UniProtKB/Swiss-Prot annotation:
Cu cation binds at residues 79, 81, 104, 160. Its cofactor is Cu cation; Zn(2+). It is an enzyme of class 1 (oxidoreductase). The keyword Disulfide bond applies. This is Superoxide dismutase [Cu-Zn]. It comes from Pasteurella multocida (strain Pm70). Gene3D superfamilies: Superoxide dismutase, copper/zinc binding domain (2.60.40.200). GO terms for molecular function: copper ion binding; superoxide dismutase activity. Its EC number is 1.15.1.1.
Length: 186
């Protein structure tokens, strides 16, 4: 009898878990959203599409849900940049990937890098993007100071090679490293 009850409880738990998972996936992107096509930046060989990031509004701020592949595992700096371009641009005689995106979006002229919830930092500062060991990224990121989709339209979404310490020290702009992937927010 105990085995039957345990088996029944296990089966019910599995069904409930599957239902909850499917229910969450079905309602993940309800309502208004922005889909941002993201490309791995390579000015020499041409950019390669690696997926998308879906941006939605929530009661807690904008949610950035990545559906990306072919990235290096680990944490990456993740920001909204000023200009709606992912093009390479020349700087000091060298072609720099994604430089046409400009700097971090800073409409309040804070003039410094910081945490996504800091009132005295760029509005474009997002939480770091976590990339799984298999090179995929699918964990949502919440930007609590950004409330409306219209606020980010006409900008670009940038992924940097390294992590982000959310400070200008010891390295400027969180020490995130070169621009690795980008998408224009339309």
């Amino acid at each position: 009898m105990k085995k039957t009850v345990l088996a029944l409880m296990f089966s019910c738990g599995m069904v409930a878990s599957a239902f909850a998972h499917n229910h969450a996936v079905e309602h993940k992107h309800t309502g208004e959203m922005l889909e941002v096509k993201v490309e791995l930046l390579d000015p020499a060989k041409g950019n390669q599409e690696i997926g998308k990031v879906v941006i939605t509004e929530s009661a807690y701020g904008l949610v950035f849900t990545p559906e990306l592949k072919n990235l290096t595992a680990g944490l990456h700096g993740f920001h909204i940049h000023q200009n709606p371009s992912c093009d390479a641009k020349e700087k000091d005689g060298k072609l720099v990937a994604g430089l046409a995106a400009g700097g971090h979006w800073d409409p309040k002229n804070a003039g410094k890098h910081g945490y996504p919830w800091s009132d005295d930092a760029h509005l474009g500062d997002l939480p770091a993007l976590a990339v799984n060991q298999d090179g995929t990224a699918n964990n949502p990121v919440l930007a609590p100071r950004l409330k409306h989709l219209d606020d980010v339209k006409g900008r670009s979404l940038m992924i940097h090679e390294g992590g982000d310490n959310h400070d200008d020290h010891p390295a400027p702009l969180g020490g995130g490293g070169p621009r690795m992937a980008c998408g224009v927010i339309k």
